[in-house]
Curated annotation (Swiss-Prot):
GO MF annotation list: identical protein binding; N2-acetyl-L-ornithine:2-oxoglutarate 5-aminotransferase activity; pyridoxal phosphate binding
Residues the record lists as N6-(pyridoxal phosphate)lysine modifications: 254
NCBIfam families xref list: arg_catab_astC, argD, PRK01278.1, PRK05093.1, PRK12381.1
PANTHER family named in the record: AMINOTRANSFERASE CLASS III, SUCCINYLORNITHINE TRANSAMINASE
Remaining remarks: May also have succinyldiaminopimelate aminotransferase activity, thus carrying out the corresponding step in lysine biosynthesis.
Cofactor: how bound: Binds 1 pyridoxal phosphate per subunit.
Catalyzed reactions per annotation: N(2)-acetyl-L-ornithine + 2-oxoglutarate = N-acetyl-L-glutamate 5-semialdehyde + L-glutamate
Protein's name in the database: Acetylornithine aminotransferase
GO cellular component, one term: cytoplasm
Listed pathway(s): Amino-acid biosynthesis; L-arginine biosynthesis; N(2)-acetyl-L-ornithine from L-glutamate: step 4/4
Organism: Vibrio cholerae serotype O1 (strain ATCC 39315 / El Tor Inaba N16961)
Source domain of life: Bacteria
Enzyme class: transferase
Pfam family, one: Aminotran_3
Amino acid sequence: MTVEMSVDRSSFDEVMVPCYNPMEFIPVKGFGSRIWDQQGHEYIDFAGGIAVSCLGHCHPVMVQALTTQANKLWHLSNVMTNEPALRLAKKLTQVSFAEKVFFANSGAEANEAALKLARRYAADVYGPEKSEIIAFNQGFHGRTFFTVSVGGQATYSDGFGPKPGDIVHLPYNDLAALQAQISDRTCAVMMEPLQGEGGIVSPSAEFVQAVRELCDKHNALLIFDEVQTGNGRTGDFYAYQGIGVTPDILATAKSLGGGFPIGAMLTTAKIAEHMKVGVHGSTYGGNPLACAVAEAVVDFVAQPEILAGVKQREQWMRAELEKINQKYQLFKEIRGKGLLLGAALNDEWQGRARDILVAAGKQGLMVLVAGASVVRFTPSLIISQQEIEEGMARLDKAIATLM
């Protein structure tokens, strides 16, 4: 029988690789949009595990799906398929443009699969010289060597030796730069339909439409990284549906499992046929436990009233942030869409987003940052208006301590 060992925050420094700098408190229980730490302190969660906990913590629909599947079948590998994976794949094709699905364990793996597929497709159809990948500065696509190199942030990609080649980074939303770079050598353009880690930056409608047209002109694939924006986060099931531009390949993860690790790459049958047996794979991809939970999440989030509710909650969040800004005048703008929002700090507050995050934690509120000067909010898609107002009151108190 396993004996539960006593651990605290100092245990992290003792035994964990120092990739992270976690908060001083350790959550031990969560329900809905609230969590409690080892000392019993309660927090309202506006972070959602970085846009993951779309139904909050321990939602009964997810708990039931996991419990039921846990009593049936845990793992097979892809030597065999399984019912939850097939049902989930069917449902993902029903809520998107896709005809084919590849399952992985994370957003990074989904993006890795997307990039490999794009390169494979281009080589098969047009020849090996068509290999250039265009991505954008301040983008973020994961931490594998390929995806972190495609992501346009040197902080994450430098220091590991030679990078994968034929990757070009351009300014986001800069159509002239894209027009000057894209050519018949371009294999794919990869972008977030709303940059998350890069500061919650939305593209213009004209830019996204032009990207699609330029990709078509040069026979390049358009890859949308919807790891953070997907599964209802923006008020559409996928963000591309709200901007009227359909990609060729889409990567999804985070909210897909609502907290249970899963990722997926979605594409068309024509493109997918180039990923033949043995070309790519994942031992855990399509795991029955993960797919059972994700199926429950998709069923819940895809309801029209849930998606409409995300848009309503965006308005509640914006109204409360405007109240705070009228009082303290520290935000220059509120960015984003749905429940992927960022409060960009003004010149006087530049670089102090983490100060606000830490102060908020001391007041019982969990928030995120998106760079040094943007406070990010990615709460549950079904957080109540009362919890939004209460959380914002705690944010108000936190900011007051920094004035």
